[in-house]
């Protein structure tokens, strides 16, 4: 009788090879009945001896028990966004900037790779010794949500790399998506069950990836194309085309509709071809990604703050459609701003039915010379947000009347005002239900107090039933009352009360941001909180020395004036008093004050005016932790090595940046050198 361990290993190999041939190569090599028999044999072996289970076993694709939630994880390599180009001129301008940063003549030819931009959801896959260890969403580019159990169900993602002697770690980036035919089948099933239909494949994919039950994910049959590869040190292929070939050989599905082009003209032909040919593809694509092929040239070009200079996404022109304007409504934002909304006869755009679009403000209405009954042209900006592009006045009915914005708030009936040169018309009634709902949503949002379990629907119930009239009222709710509301149970209510209680310990800058003061975003809130350790000191400065606020980096007189106006409005003063009564200090903790003081002391520190580059994997510090230490000491972190670089901080698998730094005579530091340099 065969050894169970050897037989299980043999079955894993046979089934994984067959799965790769079927899902990735589209060339089945095993009969379905044979596959099913071998699969059942492996499953039985693993059930009899759980010690035989391995992460790369095909039995692990079906998903385990539902998860309670997702954890946030840091990406080993950041996932930056791409700059966009919307036409040939934009693409040419990007190419000219690239030549300039590479110090090449304007007529130079650069090797470029053209790839289809798949309209799905980006994933980060981490492999350790050839086995899938972790999968995460893109998130904010630095951190994402771990969804490994869900990603294991995607058959075109190998659980084990199909290569001999894989590197110790491999990082892969790619796009999860739902093919058009699969999407149609999913919506047909949902329609039969009388469930809400998904708007488009991208939305369906995003919702599927965040399902807590992997079995639901498996049933929706997601697909995946790999497009980015990160390997340690010298193992990294020399260019993008070679990286795609490596991914293909390792068992990943790589989009076959790609091309290695010798110059910009060839890339433009590639883009033109797929702008027309995309409609014949079995999946959605919303553009072409153009990348510089050569890795050394990529390193030389470097990055801006948010995107690589060596790549660009050429977006296809937005679809447009004519329709008839029926009416113009109005929405009230959390600051009281009135946003006019065009309502028109529904038209299909980019895979969805569209019947509403923002008109932004009164100036936009005047610019369009909009009349009720007009024939308007609508498009989706970036194929996401509907907008009115223009009016066709030659089709205007003789009895059409100009669109007028309301004079009273549609929510509370108060008179609307328009201050100075502002484009926005506003409701200034602090008791307006719409302003209250928006303020509550902002207060509990992730960047502010980050209260889990308090969504828009629940906020609407609380406001509409008169249970909450201010931010402070949230903290007077008890579990019994919450449990009586729609879609709330005892456990959900108890968890929400605990989450609200915990939010009182959020840092001072989050509390300040959560107040929703006009022009005070997250960055400005941090700057203000670091300079003024309490709401009282901030209010005093706003009254007696507003120039102190205006002089802060990134603030200025307009923001200072807005802050002063808010702080000295009686209704807001009452709100601050109420927040204190429910347990908010509205001031920085001792540790926050010490950290801010230290940061201020280090503003002229050892790295003031210095430019550093990070490369490789540091033994103890994450990339973001090292960056924070450098910036706290007054230094600047750049994405590329140049003659202006003062220090290169190099970890394991430093790669080409280390080579370039050494050739330029840049001082190279280890993590230990960096921490020693920062010691007082």
From Swiss-Prot:
This is DNA ligase. NAD(+) binds at residues 32-36, 81-82, 115, 138, 175, 291, 315. PANTHER family: CHROMOSOME TRANSMISSION FIDELITY FACTOR 18, DNA LIGASE. Keywords: DNA damage, DNA repair, DNA replication, Ligase, Magnesium, Manganese, Metal-binding, NAD, Zinc. Its cofactor is Mg(2+); Mn(2+). The keyword Manganese applies. InterPro entries: BRCT_dom (IPR001357), BRCT_dom_sf (IPR036420), DisA/LigA_HHH (IPR041663), DNA_ligase (IPR001679), DNAligase_adenylation (IPR013839), DNAligase_N (IPR013840), NA-bd_OB-fold (IPR012340), NAD_DNA_ligase_OB (IPR004150). Gene3D superfamilies: 5' to 3' exonuclease, C-terminal subdomain (1.10.150.20), 6.20.10.30, BRCT domain (3.40.50.10190), DNA ligase/mRNA capping enzyme (3.30.470.30), Helix hairpin bin (1.10.287.610), Nucleic acid-binding proteins (2.40.50.140). It comes from the Bacteria. It catalyses: NAD(+) + (deoxyribonucleotide)n-3'-hydroxyl + 5'-phospho-(deoxyribonucleotide)m = (deoxyribonucleotide)n+m + AMP + beta-nicotinamide D-nucleotide. GO terms for molecular function: DNA ligase (NAD+) activity; metal ion binding. Pfam families: BRCT, DNA_ligase_aden, DNA_ligase_OB, DNA_ligase_ZBD, HHH_2, HHH_5. Zn(2+) binds at residues 409, 412, 427, 432. PROSITE patterns: BRCT (PS50172). Residues 602-680 form the BRCT domain. GO terms for cellular component: cytosol. It comes from Synechococcus sp. (strain CC9605). Residues 47-66 are annotated as: Disordered. It is an enzyme of class 6 (ligase). Belongs to the NAD-dependent DNA ligase family. LigA subfamily. GO terms for biological process: DNA repair; DNA replication. The active site is at residue 117. DNA ligase that catalyzes the formation of phosphodiester linkages between 5'-phosphoryl and 3'-hydroxyl groups in double-stranded DNA using NAD as a coenzyme and as the energy source for the reaction. It is essential for DNA replication and repair of damaged DNA.
